[in-house]
A protein has these predicted regions:
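FAD-binding core of flavoproteins
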Residues: 1-80, 201-206
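Alpha-helical interface subdomain recognition
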Residues: 58-206
Protein backbone atom coordinates (compact mmCIF):
# COMPACT_ATOMS: atom_id res chain seq x y z
CA UNK A 1 0.00 0.00 0.00
CA UNK A 2 3.02 2.29 -0.30
CA UNK A 3 3.67 2.54 3.46
CA UNK A 4 7.17 1.08 3.16
CA UNK A 5 8.22 -1.43 5.83
CA UNK A 6 5.48 -3.30 7.66
CA UNK A 7 5.93 -5.55 10.71
CA UNK A 8 3.33 -8.29 11.01
CA UNK A 9 2.66 -11.26 13.29
CA UNK A 10 1.17 -14.29 11.56
CA UNK A 11 -0.18 -17.56 12.95
CA UNK A 12 2.21 -20.46 12.35
CA UNK A 13 -0.46 -22.40 10.47
CA UNK A 14 -1.82 -19.51 8.41
CA UNK A 15 -2.43 -20.31 4.74
CA UNK A 16 0.68 -19.62 2.66
CA UNK A 17 3.11 -19.72 5.60
CA UNK A 18 5.72 -22.42 5.00
CA UNK A 19 8.58 -23.36 7.35
CA UNK A 20 11.33 -25.61 6.01
CA UNK A 21 13.78 -27.24 8.43
CA UNK A 22 17.41 -26.26 7.82
CA UNK A 23 20.67 -27.97 8.76
CA UNK A 24 22.88 -25.33 10.36
CA UNK A 25 26.38 -25.18 11.84
CA UNK A 26 25.17 -25.30 15.43
CA UNK A 27 22.76 -28.24 14.89
CA UNK A 28 19.99 -26.19 16.52
CA UNK A 29 16.44 -26.21 15.10
CA UNK A 30 16.15 -23.38 12.57
CA UNK A 31 13.74 -22.91 9.69
CA UNK A 32 13.51 -21.07 6.37
CA UNK A 33 10.33 -19.00 6.22
CA UNK A 34 8.50 -18.69 2.91
CA UNK A 35 5.36 -16.58 2.44
CA UNK A 36 3.20 -17.35 -0.57
CA UNK A 37 0.13 -15.18 -1.24
CA UNK A 38 -0.45 -14.70 2.49
CA UNK A 39 -3.41 -12.52 3.44
CA UNK A 40 -2.57 -10.15 6.30
CA UNK A 41 -5.45 -8.74 8.31
CA UNK A 42 -5.31 -5.39 10.08
CA UNK A 43 -5.22 -7.21 13.42
CA UNK A 44 -1.90 -8.84 12.42
CA UNK A 45 -0.08 -5.57 11.67
CA UNK A 46 2.21 -4.42 14.49
CA UNK A 47 3.81 -1.38 12.87
CA UNK A 48 4.04 0.50 9.59
CA UNK A 49 6.38 2.94 7.88
CA UNK A 50 8.80 4.83 10.12
CA UNK A 51 7.57 3.04 13.25
CA UNK A 52 8.23 -0.30 11.57
CA UNK A 53 11.74 0.80 10.57
CA UNK A 54 12.50 1.81 14.16
CA UNK A 55 11.12 -1.46 15.51
CA UNK A 56 13.18 -3.53 13.06
CA UNK A 57 16.33 -1.55 13.90
CA UNK A 58 15.73 -2.06 17.63
CA UNK A 59 15.15 -5.80 17.21
CA UNK A 60 18.32 -6.12 15.10
CA UNK A 61 20.37 -4.19 17.65
CA UNK A 62 19.11 -6.19 20.64
CA UNK A 63 19.58 -9.45 18.72
CA UNK A 64 23.18 -8.55 17.92
CA UNK A 65 23.85 -7.67 21.56
CA UNK A 66 22.35 -11.00 22.66
CA UNK A 67 24.53 -12.81 20.11
CA UNK A 68 27.61 -11.08 21.53
CA UNK A 69 26.77 -12.21 25.07
CA UNK A 70 26.24 -15.76 23.82
CA UNK A 71 29.66 -15.56 22.18
CA UNK A 72 31.09 -14.34 25.49
CA UNK A 73 29.68 -17.35 27.31
CA UNK A 74 30.92 -19.82 24.69
CA UNK A 75 34.39 -18.22 24.61
CA UNK A 76 34.63 -18.21 28.39
CA UNK A 77 33.62 -21.87 28.60
CA UNK A 78 36.08 -22.95 25.88
CA UNK A 79 38.84 -21.04 27.67
CA UNK A 80 38.04 -22.65 31.04
CA UNK A 81 37.87 -26.12 29.50
CA UNK A 82 41.30 -25.49 28.00
CA UNK A 83 42.73 -24.30 31.31
CA UNK A 84 41.39 -27.41 33.05
CA UNK A 85 42.65 -29.77 30.34
CA UNK A 86 46.17 -28.32 30.20
CA UNK A 87 46.42 -28.47 34.00
CA UNK A 88 45.71 -32.23 33.88
CA UNK A 89 47.38 -33.31 30.63
CA UNK A 90 50.98 -34.31 31.32
CA UNK A 91 54.03 -34.39 29.08
CA UNK A 92 57.59 -35.12 30.21
CA UNK A 93 56.18 -35.80 33.66
CA UNK A 94 54.61 -32.36 34.21
CA UNK A 95 51.31 -30.67 33.28
CA UNK A 96 51.57 -28.98 29.89
CA UNK A 97 50.14 -25.83 31.51
CA UNK A 98 53.59 -25.32 33.04
CA UNK A 99 55.12 -24.85 29.58
CA UNK A 100 55.64 -21.18 28.79
CA UNK A 101 54.20 -21.35 25.27
CA UNK A 102 51.03 -23.03 26.55
CA UNK A 103 50.69 -20.54 29.39
CA UNK A 104 51.12 -17.58 27.06
CA UNK A 105 48.45 -18.81 24.64
CA UNK A 106 46.00 -19.49 27.46
CA UNK A 107 46.72 -16.06 28.97
CA UNK A 108 45.97 -14.42 25.63
CA UNK A 109 42.61 -16.20 25.63
CA UNK A 110 41.85 -14.83 29.10
CA UNK A 111 42.70 -11.27 28.02
CA UNK A 112 40.54 -11.65 24.92
CA UNK A 113 37.56 -12.95 26.88
CA UNK A 114 37.76 -10.14 29.42
CA UNK A 115 37.94 -7.53 26.65
CA UNK A 116 34.85 -9.05 25.06
CA UNK A 117 33.10 -9.07 28.45
CA UNK A 118 33.71 -5.35 28.97
CA UNK A 119 32.49 -4.48 25.47
CA UNK A 120 29.36 -6.59 25.93
CA UNK A 121 28.62 -4.92 29.28
CA UNK A 122 29.07 -1.48 27.72
CA UNK A 123 26.68 -2.22 24.86
CA UNK A 124 24.06 -3.84 27.08
CA UNK A 125 24.19 -1.07 29.69
CA UNK A 126 23.45 1.54 27.01
CA UNK A 127 20.60 -0.53 25.61
CA UNK A 128 19.21 -0.90 29.13
CA UNK A 129 19.44 2.88 29.64
CA UNK A 130 17.46 3.43 26.46
CA UNK A 131 20.14 5.52 24.75
CA UNK A 132 21.74 5.09 21.33
CA UNK A 133 23.95 2.00 21.45
CA UNK A 134 24.52 1.35 17.75
CA UNK A 135 28.25 2.09 17.92
CA UNK A 136 28.79 0.10 21.12
CA UNK A 137 26.85 -2.91 19.78
CA UNK A 138 28.87 -2.87 16.55
CA UNK A 139 32.13 -2.69 18.53
CA UNK A 140 31.01 -5.60 20.71
CA UNK A 141 30.21 -7.62 17.56
CA UNK A 142 33.71 -6.95 16.18
CA UNK A 143 35.21 -8.19 19.44
CA UNK A 144 32.81 -11.15 19.53
CA UNK A 145 33.88 -12.28 16.07
CA UNK A 146 37.61 -11.84 16.61
CA UNK A 147 37.70 -13.24 20.15
CA UNK A 148 35.58 -16.27 19.26
CA UNK A 149 37.87 -17.01 16.32
CA UNK A 150 41.08 -16.75 18.35
CA UNK A 151 39.80 -18.61 21.40
CA UNK A 152 38.41 -21.44 19.26
CA UNK A 153 41.73 -21.92 17.46
CA UNK A 154 43.75 -21.71 20.67
CA UNK A 155 41.46 -24.16 22.47
CA UNK A 156 41.72 -26.70 19.65
CA UNK A 157 45.49 -26.25 19.46
CA UNK A 158 46.05 -26.75 23.18
CA UNK A 159 43.69 -29.73 23.34
CA UNK A 160 45.46 -31.53 20.51
CA UNK A 161 43.42 -34.34 18.96
CA UNK A 162 41.09 -34.41 21.97
CA UNK A 163 39.48 -31.16 20.84
CA UNK A 164 37.84 -32.65 17.74
CA UNK A 165 36.57 -35.81 19.47
CA UNK A 166 32.77 -35.76 19.43
CA UNK A 167 32.80 -37.53 22.82
CA UNK A 168 34.46 -34.41 24.29
CA UNK A 169 32.25 -31.28 24.37
CA UNK A 170 34.76 -28.68 23.10
CA UNK A 171 33.68 -29.15 19.46
CA UNK A 172 30.18 -27.97 20.41
CA UNK A 173 31.49 -24.65 21.69
CA UNK A 174 33.73 -24.24 18.65
CA UNK A 175 30.79 -24.62 16.26
CA UNK A 176 28.92 -21.97 18.25
CA UNK A 177 31.93 -19.66 18.14
CA UNK A 178 32.26 -19.99 14.38
CA UNK A 179 28.53 -19.59 13.82
CA UNK A 180 28.32 -16.47 16.00
CA UNK A 181 31.41 -15.01 14.34
CA UNK A 182 29.66 -14.88 10.96
CA UNK A 183 26.07 -14.32 12.12
CA UNK A 184 24.71 -10.78 11.58
CA UNK A 185 27.87 -9.63 9.85
CA UNK A 186 31.54 -10.49 10.15
CA UNK A 187 34.08 -8.36 12.01
CA UNK A 188 35.20 -6.84 8.70
CA UNK A 189 31.65 -5.82 7.82
CA UNK A 190 31.03 -4.21 11.20
CA UNK A 191 34.40 -2.45 11.13
CA UNK A 192 33.48 -1.03 7.73
CA UNK A 193 30.16 0.21 9.13
CA UNK A 194 31.97 1.83 12.06
CA UNK A 195 34.44 3.44 9.67
CA UNK A 196 31.56 4.92 7.69
CA UNK A 197 30.05 6.36 10.88
CA UNK A 198 33.38 7.91 11.87
CA UNK A 199 33.88 9.38 8.40
CA UNK A 200 30.38 10.86 8.53
CA UNK A 201 31.00 12.36 11.97
CA UNK A 202 28.43 10.08 13.61
CA UNK A 203 30.77 8.24 16.00
CA UNK A 204 33.56 9.20 18.42
CA UNK A 205 32.96 12.88 17.70
CA UNK A 206 32.53 15.44 20.49
Amino acid sequence: DGDGAVVVMLPRKAEGVVLEAMEVTTYEPQYRLTLSNVRVGAENILARGEQAQQLLASVAEHTMAALCTHQLGASDKAMRMTASYTAERQQFGVPIATFQAVGHRAANCFIDVECLRLNCYQAISRLDDGVDASVEVAIAKVWAGDVGHRVSYAAQHLHGGTGIDRDYPLWRYCTWLRHNEMMLGSSARNLAALGSKIAAGEAFCA
